[in-house]
A protein has these predicted regions:
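A short, conserved beta-strand element in the Rossmann-like catalytic core
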Residues: 1-2, 98
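Conserved core of the sugar-phosphate nucleotidyltransferase
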Residues: 2-90
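Helix N-cap/beta->alpha junction signal
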Residues: 25, 102-103
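A short acidic, often aromatic-flanked loop/helix-cap motif at beta-alpha or helix-coil junctions
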Residues: 30-32, 97-100
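Residues at or immediately preceding the N-termini of alpha-helices
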Residues: 61, 104-107
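SAM-dependent methyltransferases
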Residues: 77-79, 96, 106-120
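Conserved active-site beta-strand element of glycosyltransferases/polysaccharide synthases
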Residues: 89-93, 99-102
Length: 120
């Protein structure tokens, strides 16, 4: 319910335009740093080319079926499986409202966003 319609439109349009695998992405806003084994901060990772991958992800049916049939490796999402096949994954604009809901804080944020949308 949090994904704005334009994100779905972007994903579907990219698949229809010939991309076999598509993910919505948003720029990272946090500073990203490496951390060494002794918990010391290492280098700051330049974030200008980094993006957070969101859902919904889009695929042609044959590519997604092949990925699920052939990939038996640890991955975090379907796009990771498709990449293991050597297939490029295309990025489209996502939206900050389409965040992943996995932690208790995410539930609070999602509820607040839903309430905000309901009352505007």
């Amino acid at each position: 319910p949090l994904v704005p319609p334009e994100v779905i439109t972007n994903v579907v349009a990219a698949v229809r335009n010939g991309h076999a695998a598509v993910v919505p992405v948003v720029p990272l806003v946090d500073t990203i740093r490496t951390v060494t084994g002794d918990a010391s901060l290492g280098a700051t990772v330049p974030r200008d080319s980094l993006r957070a991958v969101q859902t919904p992800q889009g695929f042609t049916r044959d590519v997604l079926q092949r990925a699920h049939a052939e990939v038996d490796a640890p991955v975090t999402d379907d796009a990771g499986m498709v990449e293991r096949l050597g297939i490029a994954v295309h990025a489209v604009d996502g939206h900050e409202d389409a965040f992943k809901v996995t932690r208790p804080l995410d539930v609070v944020l999602a509820e607040a966003l839903i309430e905000h949308r309901r009352t505007r």
